[in-house]
């Protein structure tokens, strides 16, 4: 089954950010990342 995306990893459609993190971005490189809340 899909797993959650950990902090400081790119947000992925398959795998929501893990509890305590949320998708932030996009950053200067154009990628959004899961970051600690």
Swiss-Prot record:
Main location (coarse class): secreted
Site, as annotated: Important for the neurotoxic activity: 31
A single cellular component GO annotation: extracellular region
Domain of life: Eukaryota
A molecular function GO annotation: toxin activity
SS bond partners: 4-18, 11-23, 14-15, 17-34
InterPro entries, A to Z: Toxin_16 (IPR012499)
Site (Critical for the neurotoxic activity) residue list: 9-10, 14-15, 33
Coiled coil (residue ranges): none
Intracellular or extracellular location(s): Secreted
Tissue expression notes: Expressed by the venom gland.
Keywords from the named record: Calcium-activated potassium channel impairing toxin, Disulfide bond, Ion channel impairing toxin, Knottin, Neurotoxin, Potassium channel impairing toxin, Secreted, Toxin
Job description of the protein: This excitatory toxin inhibits insect calcium-activated potassium (KCa) channels (Slo-type).
Similarity section: Belongs to the neurotoxin 11 (kappa toxin) family.
Comment field on protein domains: The presence of a 'disulfide through disulfide knot' structurally defines this protein as a knottin.
UniProt name for this protein: Lambda-hexatoxin-Hf1a
Protein source organism: Hadronyche formidabilis
């Amino acid at each position: 089954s899909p797993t959650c995306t950990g902090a400081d990893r790119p947000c992925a459609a398959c795998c929501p950010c893990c509890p305590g993190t949320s998708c932030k971005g996009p950053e200067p490189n154009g990628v959004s990342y899961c970051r600690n809340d």
